[in-house]
Amino acid sequence: MSDEVTYATLMLQDSARVRGNQDGNNLRKEGHPAQSSLWRGAALSLMTLCLVLVTGLVTLATMFLQVSNDINSDSEKLSQLQKSIHPQQDNLSESLNSSRKSLTEESLQSQISALLERQEQMATKLCKEFLIHASDHKCNPCPKTWQWYGNSCYYFSINEEKSWSDSRKDCIDKNATLVKIDSTEERDLLQSQLSLTFSFFWLGLSWNSSGRNWLWEDGSFPPPTLFSDKELASFNGSRDCAYFERGNIYASRCSAEIPWICEKTASLVKTEDLD
């Protein structure tokens, strides 16, 4: 009896063990699909991430190539620009140096001219002082028997009288012209000499029949500021030459014989003649 009980017990235990093993196997078989799905999801995510990374790398590589090409193109343009700028810079430098040199030369020339002018003024002033005490001083810029006033030398024909044409010829022989009055100062100066020498004299002014006007020997017109319109209107075609008297000009026959005055530019006063 006890043997039967023991056998029955063993059979029940074996049966229970078999069922337990079957249940465990069934549980393992049921759990495998869940793990496989999880791995597939992870793999898909990794593949997607790799695809995104590859796409990003390709995009970055494309952008890098584009930027590299742009840099190379800009470098070539910069190089060409530098090549074109260098000659311009050289030309600009040469022009600047030339301008500086020109300005320096002009400045020096201006200073030299100013110094020479100042020297001439001082020499002229000293010479006039010397001539007050010695009329024949060697610094005199005018020939002997000539009078020096301003920038001109004057020759007064004190003891001679000639026609206008002969007077003009005499002045030409002296490398001068019949006097031309350019300013009120010169007019007043000549007027002051009349009381000392003579009362009237020929002018280098004559009637131009073709132009129907009065002209100085250099072809210029007598200024209306020196002689009134009334005085100019007093001229007529029968009297073709002009003379000066008491501060005015008058017309006369050119054949009339009266004194005359020659005029020419005074020479520069030499500093070595001031000794």
Curated annotation (Swiss-Prot):
Biological process terms in GO annotation: melanocyte proliferation; negative regulation of receptor signaling pathway via STAT
Record membrane topology: Single-pass type II membrane protein
Keywords: Cell membrane, Disulfide bond, Glycoprotein, Lectin, Membrane, Phosphoprotein, Receptor, Signal-anchor, Transmembrane, Transmembrane helix
Positions occupied by motif ITIM motif: 5-10
Residues modified to Phosphotyrosine: 7
Native source organism of the sequence: Mus musculus (Mouse)
Self-association and partners: Homodimer. Interacts (via ITIM motif) with PTPN6. Interacts (via ITIM motif) with PTPN11; this interaction triggers dephosphorylation and activation of PTPN11.
Pfam families: Lectin_C, Ly49
Gene from which the chain derives: Clec12b
Signal peptide: none
Name of the protein: C-type lectin domain family 12 member B
Subcellular location: Cell membrane
Positions on the Extracellular side per record topology: 65-275
